[in-house]
Curated annotation (Swiss-Prot):
InterPro entries: ATP_synth_B-like_membr_sf, ATP_synth_b/b'su_bac/chlpt, ATP_synth_F0_bsu_bac, ATP_synthase_B_chain. It holds the Pfam family ATP-synt_B. Belongs to the ATPase B chain family. The gene is atpF. This is ATP synthase subunit b. CDD domains: ATP-synt_Fo_b (cd06503). It is a single-pass membrane protein. GO terms for cellular component: plasma membrane; proton-transporting ATP synthase complex. It is found in: Cell inner membrane.
């Protein structure tokens, strides 16, 4: 193997090329790789933050869902209580109305009984007068014997 001038020239050219690349090309490649590494790291960080945010949002949504269910249960319970209260009030009102109607009917019955008694007293008094007229054969003066008729009516 002969080392000639061509091999030395190629070696010098290769060394010059390496020095040129190290001075001008290599720093730009390193800067681009560092920038890309930085962007990848930021992307991974953002993904981690997004995962944490998602987990936090899921916890918050679960908490809100639980609160909403509790509120719905409370509202349903209150509605049931109010419904039962309305039913009880309606029952009480119906009982009171029934008692009022019963009392009114009882008063009406008593009034009609009293009226019937008065009518019967009047009829009995008239029959007594007619019977007395027939027995005595004379007309009995109702005005003269009104006290007697009143006593008789009161006794009946």
């Amino acid at each position: 193997m002969n080392i000639n001038l061509t091999l030395i020239g190629q070696s010098l050219t290769f060394i010059a090329f390496i020095l040129f690349c190290m001075k001008y090309v290599w720093p730009q490649l390193i800067a681009m790789m560092e920038e890309r590494e930085k962007r990848i790291a930021e992307g991974l960080e953002a993904a981690d933050r997004a995962d944490k945010d998602l987990e936090l949002a899921q916890k918050k949504a679960g908490k809100q869902l639980t609160e909403a269910k509790e509120q719905a249960a409370t509202i349903v319970e209150q509605a049931n209580k109010r419904g039962n209260q309305i039913v009880e009030e309606a029952k009480e009102a119906a009982v009171a109305e029934g008692e009022r109607i019963k009392a009114a009917a009882q008063a009406e019955i008593e009034r009609q009984v009293a009226q019937a008694r008065e009518e019967l007293r009047g009829k009995v008094a008239a029959l007594a007068i007619q019977g007395a007229e027939k027995v005595l054969g004379t007309t009995v003066d109702a005005k003269a014997h009104s006290e007697m008729l009143d006593k008789l009516a009161a006794e009946l």
